[in-house]
Amino acid sequence: MKLMDVRVSGLNVWITDKHILKGISFKAQPGTVTAIMGPSGSGKSTLIRVINRLIDLIPGARVEGEVWINNMNVMKEDPYNIRRYTGMVFQEPNPFPHMTIYENVAIGPKLHGLAKNKKELDEIVEWALKMAHLWDEVKDRLSDYPHQLSGGQRQRLSLARALALKPRVLLLDEPTANIDPVSTVKIEQSIVEYAKEEMATVIIVTHTPQQAARISDQILFLYEGRVIEYGPTKELVLRPRHELTKKFLGGEV
């Protein structure tokens, strides 16, 4: 099992002439969950899109500073190599609509040659669906299509698809923002279990302090593109040092 950390140093991002991220630095370790927390428009989603080079797809984006995944310089590495080790789950569920539940989870391992035969592929699919807390709900309907699932189930299917490749770095952009409370709890459980059991580096964007407090080991609090506070979750939540952090935790900003 290869352990991979994420290190960000002096990161600045502009989109056309707008300065989105301003001097961001932090480190995320294997076996931990890092929550990037802050109000809408603080640059949270932009930050994780730099880590897996999705920033390249945004017209007018310019990046300065350093981002490392282990010994890979993210901004100089081939994006394909970066994405071999990183998984991504977005805010909106995005399973492949014309593939079955089984095919959605199996497609990644098949393309990357992770299974020698059908039995091994079946085992990967079952493991990923169990890790996403979806297996018990779909094990007898693997040939169904995503439109036959609820929104929360579709999001857990998106998570299972990402987990099937066992990414060493898992990035999640507000994955529970638009789903039901039951699926939210299950996805939060999956995130923590995956980080701990697979010693993966997990980074989740959230605008909800309560979610950050429940699942993360450390919090990076962003406000208007700057790091306001960064540290262990319990310490930051119980003893915030900055007035803006106190206000955000109290629902005032």
Curated annotation (Swiss-Prot):
GO MF annotations, alphabetized: ATP binding; ATP hydrolysis activity; ATPase-coupled phosphate ion transmembrane transporter activity
Signal peptide feature range: none
Subcellular location: Cell membrane
Pfam family, one: ABC_tran
Reactions catalysed according to its record: phosphate(out) + ATP + H2O = ADP + 2 phosphate(in) + H(+)
Keywords: ATP-binding, Cell membrane, Membrane, Nucleotide-binding, Phosphate transport, Translocase, Transport
Family statement drawn from the similarity comment of this UniProt entry: Belongs to the ABC transporter superfamily. Phosphate importer (TC 3.A.1.7) family.
Protein name: Phosphate import ATP-binding protein PstB
Organism: Aeropyrum pernix (strain ATCC 700893 / DSM 11879 / JCM 9820 / NBRC 100138 / K1)
